[in-house]
């Protein structure tokens, strides 16, 4: 099992839209808005690291997503 925590910066005014799209992605077990350096935290669970990479690529393709940082545990 592989777990990921994706920390996301989002363009101004886009947090709600981005969060709704992220929550629909298969493999995302939770996603929520936060305060501080990042705007959204996403928790992901997959069977393989390659699946985690595909999910993070999908997140990065969402309009309004800026910088991301992914933490991985397997």
What positions do the PLM features span?
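A compositional/biophysical signature of low hydrophobicity enriched in polar/charged and small residues
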Residues: 1-74
């Amino acid at each position: 099992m592989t777990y990921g925590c994706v920390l996301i910066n989002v363009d101004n005014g886009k947090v709600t839209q981005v969060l709704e799209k992220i929550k629909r992605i298969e493999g995302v077990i939770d996603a929520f808005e936060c305060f501080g350096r990042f705007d959204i935290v996403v928790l992901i669970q997959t069977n393989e690291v390659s699946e985690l990479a595909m999910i993070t690529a999908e997140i990065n393709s969402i309009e309004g997503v800026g910088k991301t940082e992914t933490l991985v545990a397997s």
